[in-house]
């Protein structure tokens, strides 16, 4: 049976995990109910110049970590979800900086950002996007599936449900974005179920409810595409997939590309 390679202990350290969070959440208090305008621009709405500057920061601080789990250094072909996620789960479980639930949650969150988001900051071209879709996304979604399948009980806390961020969507959302990026409908259904549970929990808090609604609307855009085509047509070109006539017509008619060119 194939097994994943271990993470490079010289790279994957508490210092790395802290630097990921410092970079991604700069200026945003732990547990915040709403993102700051600065954070929103950093993640979603920044200008072309601002995105380029942030990409440069990501490359400077995190490229060694991303490269250390590249296809050649961390091959995943033939591995199950559990096997792919195993090295990351093991690293979270040891939690060198204390080992409590909050420490584990923070490391898990750092991994979700590193695996799902940072490759998108480093690899934006047609030539490099296949690395995102074909390698880093499968790793990210494998870890996300593991996390949401963890048992919830009095003796343990599922990392995405840690009380400090349970009602903090600016933090908690990153555990689930890999499900949104997935082309498997089951992942989208899992995300929608989580959002429904969160809506029920927070319906009395208008600040949180509004943010949940925004995420839900964005997920609905994604899931409708996967329901219709079984995949994201805007990825066809860079992945060398032959588009269907329906996909071509849809894309030419303004179908969603989520900011991806080529």
Model-derived regions: residue spans:
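Intrinsically disordered, low-complexity activation-like regions
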Residues: 1-262
């Amino acid at each position: 049976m194939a097994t994943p390679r271990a993470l490079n202990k010289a790279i994957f350290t508490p210092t790395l995990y802290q630097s990921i969070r410092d970079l991604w959440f700069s200026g945003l208090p732990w547990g915040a109910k709403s993102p700051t305008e600065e954070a929103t621009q950093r993640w979603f709405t920044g200008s072309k110049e601002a995105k380029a500057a942030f990409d440069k920061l990501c490359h400077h601080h995190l490229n060694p970590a991303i490269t250390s789990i590249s296809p050649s250094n961390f091959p995943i072909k033939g591995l199950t979800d559990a096997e792919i996620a195993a090295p990351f789960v093991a690293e979270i479980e040891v939690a060198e900086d204390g080992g409590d639930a909050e420490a584990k949650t923070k490391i898990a969150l750092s991994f979700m950002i590193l695996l799902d988001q940072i490759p998108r900051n480093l690899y934006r071209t047609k030539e490099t996007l296949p690395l995102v879709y074909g390698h880093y996304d499968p790793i990210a979604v494998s870890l996300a599936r593991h996390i949401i399948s963890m048992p919830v009980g009095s003796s343990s806390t599922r990392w995405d449900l840690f009380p400090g961020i349970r009602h903090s969507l600016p933090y908690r959302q990153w555990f689930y974005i890999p499900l949104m990026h997935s082309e498997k409908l089951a992942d989208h259904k899992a995300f929608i179920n989580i959002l429904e549970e969160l809506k029920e929990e927070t319906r009395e808090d208008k600040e949180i409810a509004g943010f949940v609604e925004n995420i839900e609307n964005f997920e609905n855009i994604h899931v409708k595409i996967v329901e219709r085509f079984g995949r994201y047509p805007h990825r066809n070109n860079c992945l060398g997939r032959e588009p269907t006539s329906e996909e071509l017509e849809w894309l030419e008619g303004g179908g969603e590309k989520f900011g991806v060119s080529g």
